A protein has these predicted regions:
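Small-residue-enriched hydrophobic alpha-helices in membranes
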Residues: 1-186
Length: 186
């Protein structure tokens, strides 16, 4: 975990989005490198904010952090550790992103996958980024594969070799895609 990276990112987040009082305090604690579960609990108690309400806001903060770190299209080991740290601090459980912020994660993943698939080929580094995205959003292989299928289908329609796209289509899906693609060319 790199508190300096978190500090810089959360300074940017504070400038970018309008935060409630308690979220401003929590961001300040991150920026001042004094964040802990206890300090979060204290802020929530002092501001009379129920944790279940705050959890949704915490998820939004983490998503903003993820968007910030993905601006360079790379997820470093340190950045992944920072995401894990934030999940622990905010008591985020597996499935919370998908349940509470499905639209946000879909938009973030779609944006990254669109960029990854734009050249109709998935490099080893891009395949690892897909795995990293799956991991930081706590998605199953099938969930991530379903997101990837959308972009991979576009690449296949453009003539890409499916073997170079790091995606799994069922036999039926693949041949439907191939048939539809050939049908459009006639």
């Amino acid at each position: 975990m790199d508190k300096e990276n978190l500090r810089i990112s959360f300074q940017e987040i504070e400038k970018k989005i309008l935060l409630s009082d308690y979220l401003q305090e929590i961001c300040s604690a991150i920026i001042n490198k004094s964040i802990s579960k206890e300090s979060i609990d204290e802020i929530l108690k002092r501001k009379s904010v129920n944790y279940s309400i705050a959890k949704v806001d915490f998820l939004h903060l983490i998503i903003e952090y993820i968007k910030n770190i993905l601006e360079d299209d790379i997820l470093t080991v340190t950045e992944k550790e920072n995401v894990k740290f934030l999940k622990v601090m905010f008591r985020i459980q597996q499935g919370d992103f998908y349940y509470h912020n499905k639209a946000d994660i879909e938009a973030t993943i779609a944006s990254q996958l669109s960029r990854i698939y734009q050249d109709n080929y998935i490099s080893d580094e891009e395949a690892l980024l897909k795995v990293d995205l799956q991991e930081i959003f706590d998605l199953s292989f099938d969930q991530m594969n379903d997101y990837a299928k959308v972009e991979a289908a576009i690449s296949i329609q453009k003539g890409a070799d499916p073997k170079s796209l790091d995606v799994f289509f069922t036999h039926k899906e693949f041949f439907k895609l191939k048939y539809d693609n050939n049908d459009n060319k006639v």
